[in-house]
From Swiss-Prot:
Membrane topology qualifier: Lipid-anchor
MF GO annotations: GDP binding; GTP binding; GTPase activity
Naturally occurring in which organism (per UniProt): Homo sapiens (Human)
Keywords, sorted A to Z: Cell membrane, Cell projection, Cytoplasmic vesicle, Endocytosis, Endosome, GTP-binding, Lipoprotein, Membrane, Nucleotide-binding, Prenylation, Protein transport, Transport
Motif (Effector region): 34-42
Domain of life: Eukaryota
Result of changing S19L: Loss of GTPase activity
Record protein name field: Ras-related protein Rab-22A
Compartments, as annotated in UniProt: Endosome membrane; Cell membrane; Early endosome; Late endosome
Pfam families in alphabetical order: Ras
Basic and acidic residues composition-biased segments: 185-194
SUPFAM superfamilies: P-loop containing nucleoside triphosphate hydrolases
């Protein structure tokens, strides 16, 4: 079975639950007292998708303003980006559009974009309507899903949909789909002055 390594970065404001989504996906656990990410953290998980193994190389970036300038370093070369907002905080959805703009300017041209409205278990204090977020995601051709890292809602489904949307690669190429052939150039006849 072929193994593909897929770099995925999580972007979004601080406190939206990026780290909790990663922990739920990788470790199937939830820590309500998880500390904010400083800079970025890295985790991996391999899952089977159709006839391939997809090894997700997950970069969880810090959402604090002081670390925002580092984000392009993490999403360069990414196969996918998950931009997370908190459904209970309208301002996190508003700034999500800035994350998308920055990603479109500095990220790979064919990056798969997913928008995750996290904390969908808190519907009683919802500020962002699901329809508004879905319409925005559709307008930029992004995956859209509402998630709850706390209750394990749509976390695995999010990564399955990313696997589905990432273009397949030629089986003869190394993982990541990037490859080239070396060809020997005919050598010029040797000349001598003597």
């Amino acid at each position: 079975m072929a193994l593909r390594e897929l770099k995925v970065c999580l972007l979004g404001d601080t406190g939206v639950g990026k780290s909790s989504i990663v922990w739920r996906f990788v470790e199937d656990s939830f820590d309500p007292n998880i500390n904010p990410t400083i800079g970025a953290s890295f985790m991996t998980k391999t899952v089977q998708y159709q006839n391939e193994l997809h090894k997700f190389l997950i970069w969880d970036t810090a959402g604090q303003e002081r670390f925002r300038a580092l984000a392009p370093m993490y999403y360069r070369g990414s196969a996918a980006a998950i931009i997370v907002y908190d459904i209970t905080k309208e301002e996190t959805f508003s700034t999500l559009k800035n994350w998308v703009k920055e990603l479109r300017q500095h990220g790979p041209p064919n990056i798969v974009v997913a928008i995750a409205g996290n904390k969908c278990d808190l519907i009683d204090v919802r500020e962002v309507m699901e329809r508004d977020a879905k319409d925005y995601a559709d307008s930029i051709h992004a995956i859209f899903v509402e998630t709850s890292a706390k209750n394990a809602i749509n976390i695995n489904e999010l990564f399955i949909e990313i696997s589905r949307r990432i273009p397949s690669t030629d089986a003869n190429l190394p993982s990541g789909g990037k490859g080239f052939k070396l060809r020997r150039q005919p050598s010029e006849p040797k000349r001598s002055c003597c």
